[in-house]
């Protein structure tokens, strides 16, 4: 079993993998708030992704590369040690955005990971990417141009490093409108649906990744210093393995597909001079299989500049590392998983930097507060991991866990 990182709802995992997640209650999401739409940024310029072996060409909806030089953009430089917070779409659109910037001004926080495309497929601002416009991804209360400019003015003024989070495969909006890009059922060729009744994009489709590339380039043109790709995987659902068909896999394993696609994305973005980073399950450091989702440590660790494992103690089952409740032992759990990461990475060529995601939310007992958050951070420091990012699905954090600036 494994828990969905956004809601905390427990999901099933491939039967071979039993390190999964303890069952728990769903976390509360923020209510929608925002501003009316205006034009967002200078046009994103892209080139088609280099299709991996056995792949097909990029879609017609990708943005054409132009020769016109974009206006100069001042990018916030990468901090020597990154300490960040996740900012969901609704927090970015509301007053919470300014509160989170204020937290960064007062504490050790120096980076914000902001949803540019969330796991519903919604884009934060009015997009110049034709496909985003066509499917209405940017039409649900997008951030206004004025607010977007004010946001980046504030981030630059306070030297806060902005990271654009772009969800790749979990996009029910696009999968529902581009059925040819959705995962299909083997039995009848209709879209495969997860347990919530939502379709997923097929990770074997190069067009799926091209859309993410187009949005990444646009985010960079808007002013984001870095792009972070999430859901770079197959669905974590036993039924998918039994029911779904992937014609473009051409005999490749799920892990090989993810390896190939990440490599193609990285090659495509090299000329854009922005770091490529990916989120992965924290369990990948300990589990030696791909867990049914296509994420196997040795096959993705050299496919990005930075890998961000989600090492939430609540996501480790009772008995893992000999702990009756890993969630009740945040220091020990993080200490053990980070040691596994170091062991799995030692000796590998071109391995990415590792920046762990830590848990600042409650999923099962005990309730998490400043002490539990700080225990995770200390475990990281004791293992030589000095950069980190905190995750709370509602973007509400225990500021007393953060050191003053």
Could you describe each region identified by the protein language model?
Residues 33-36:
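Bacterial signal peptide processing site
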Residues 98-122, 221-226, 303-306, 380-387:
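Catalytic domains of carbohydrate-active enzymes, especially glycoside hydrolases
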Residues 109-143, 236, 242, 402:
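Aromatic-lined carbohydrate-binding/catalytic grooves of carbohydrate-active enzymes
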Residues 163-171, 228, 254-293, 349-362:
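Aromatic-lined carbohydrate-recognition surfaces of secreted/lumenal glycan-active proteins
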